Amino acid sequence: MNILFSKRLGILTIGSLLVLAGCQTSGSSAGESNQTTSSSAVEEDSSKTQEQTSDSHTHEHSHDHSHAHDEETEKIYEGYFKNSQVKDRLLSDWEGDWQSVYPYLQDGTLDEVFSYKSEHEGGKTAEEYKEYYKKGYQTDVDRIVIQKDTVTFFKNGKEYSGKYTYDGYEILTYDAGNRGVRYIFKLAKKAEGLPQYIQFSDHSIYPTKASHYHLYWGDDREALLDEVKNWPTYYPSKMDGHDIAHEMMAH
């Protein structure tokens, strides 16, 4: 990058070289990602400052990186990824207070979601979508609280708590050709009312805080992996039904 300090040719000072090096370092840091993104330097008018040049360079890198990252995230969400991209996760990724969406299906709050899907995705009527999701969301566990390694199930007015330890993940291939990852946790000590295994699926494949998730639970680890018709779904308890509906339509 050539910098014109005046109309007459001059000799770059050591200080100018240091400023230049700082500008280049700033740009490369902002553009760091799995996919290398390049951007060209923009010629500046002599009245503009070095700082403005650096900011422009950084913004361009950040924009390109964000766009590439969003595309990759969307592909992963849809179930298209490489095995090498899958990483282990901690239970803390699902930490929080969660509510089942099943009651919102029952009271009609999610009807707008099914109408939206019918109109934009096709294949089923709104009523057919509702019936499909009714089977998927159905559960008697209306709330789940996860704190550190402890999971508490709220079922029929009663609470059941136990500690769970990480038991690896399984990559599943669905009939449609896309894939998903189940993150599995095992009950550390047998306790009344608690499943031996819980399996999370949230469309992510590496450490990240979940915004919602599908949960499978039972005492047979392998049998749970075959369950693809019933997937109780949980969103943060602080969200109301309409917020959840709009979040669903955004995906």
Swiss-Prot record:
Any one GO molecular-function label of the UniProt entry: zinc ion binding
Highest rank taxon of the organism: Bacteria
Intrachain S-S bonds: none
Region (Disordered): 25-72
Comp. bias (Polar residues): 25-41
Keywords on record: Metal-binding, Signal, Zinc
Record carries keyword Membrane: no
Comp. bias regions, Basic and acidic residues: 54-72
Chain sites annotated for binding Zn(2+) 2: H212, E247, H251
PROSITE patterns from the UniProt entry: PROKAR_LIPOPROTEIN
Annotated signal peptide: 1-30
Ligand binding (Zn(2+) 1): H203, H212, H214
Recorded family membership: Belongs to the calycin superfamily. ZinT family.
Protein name: Probable metal-binding protein YrpE
